A protein has these predicted regions:
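Short, charge-rich amphipathic alpha-helical segments embedded
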Residues: 8-40, 65-77, 101-116, 182-192
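Primarily a tetratricopeptide repeat
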Residues: 8, 15, 54, 58, ...
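Residues that mark the junctions of alpha-helical repeat units in TPR/alpha-solenoid scaffolds
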Residues: 32-36, 73, 146, 150, ...
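Amphipathic helix-loop-helix modules that constitute alpha-helical solenoid scaffolds
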Residues: 85-174, 202-212
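Compositionally biased, long intrinsically disordered regions
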Residues: 49, 55-62, 70-104, 169
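TPR-repeat structural position
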Residues: 10, 53, 70, 90, ...
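Tandem amphipathic alpha-helical repeat scaffolds
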Residues: 1-6, 38-49, 75-86, 118-127, ...
Length: 230
């Protein structure tokens, strides 16, 4: 099934995974947990990639209900978010992402205003004060799995928030910068710092600052070989 998925044969992959699910023993979530979880998660993703959202929605809640820890829920949540984006249901994508982020310890205001944006902007500028690109590019690599998952989910909802809830968008970017400063850089930090630079240029008119953060984003892209963000 995974080989078929890697070959973009998503329909065949889904059939393989569903066959695997059908062959599981009785009470599989207890007696074959890892295999059962992997098959259901893979079936959820293969259905999404095949554009079969009805089948995806059959497996998605089963995975969420039966997974044993929060980090195991991240992948199915991501699939659901990406599916909402594919269906142009941006508010649903954002709602789903915020729901998981809260569980991951990253809460956001339900109705963000420009006051929230200005407060977080000031906090971000304070955290960045005295730190040039040389210091920022050499931050240690992020190792906290919960924060790494939060970074992925924030990246997943960033574009949706840009179009559907514009006051949330900068809050998401600022939070990604905060996490990078506190817990270290990931490939996604390249996106965070570069987009922060866009905000500096496009919103605040701070062209030199914005340009420097854009350069930092490119440096981190190369450092982490972040092909998905190029």
């Amino acid at each position: 099934g995974r080989k078929a998925k890697q070959s973009s044969a998503f329909k065949a992959a889904l059939e393989y995974f569903e066959t695997g699910i059908a062959l599981l023993k009785d009470d599989p979530w207890n007696v074959q947990y890892e295999l059962c979880r992997n098959l259901h998660t893979e079936a959820t993703e293969a259905a999404y990639l095949n554009g079969d959202f009805a089948t995806m929605d059959k497996y998605y809640p089963i995975v969420l209900k039966n997974t044993r820890n929060l980090l195991e829920k991240v992948k199915p949540y991501e699939i659901r978010i990406l599916a909402y984006k594919a269906e142009n249901k941006l508010l649903d994508a954002i709602k789903t992402g915020l729901e998981l982020l809260k569980q991951l310890g990253e809460d956001f205001p339900s109705n963000p205003t420009m006051v929230h944006v200005m407060v977080d902007l000031i906090k971000t500028k304070v955290k960045l004060s005295g730190k040039n690109n040389d210091k920022l590019k050499d931050l240690p690599a992020m190792t906290d799995e919960t924060k790494m998952a939060a970074m992925r989910i924030m990246a997943d909802i960033a574009s949706s928030s840009y179009w559907a809830t514009p006051t949330l968008f900068p809050l998401v970017i600022f939070r990604m910068v905060h996490l990078s400063l506190r817990y270290g850089n990931t490939a996604i930090s390249a996106f965070a710092f570069a987009t922060y630079g866009v905000i500096m240029c496009g919103v605040l008119g701070q062209m030199r600052n914005g340009y420097e953060f854009g350069k930092l984003g490119l440096i981190l892209l190369e450092k982490y070989n972040a092909k998905e963000w190029k």
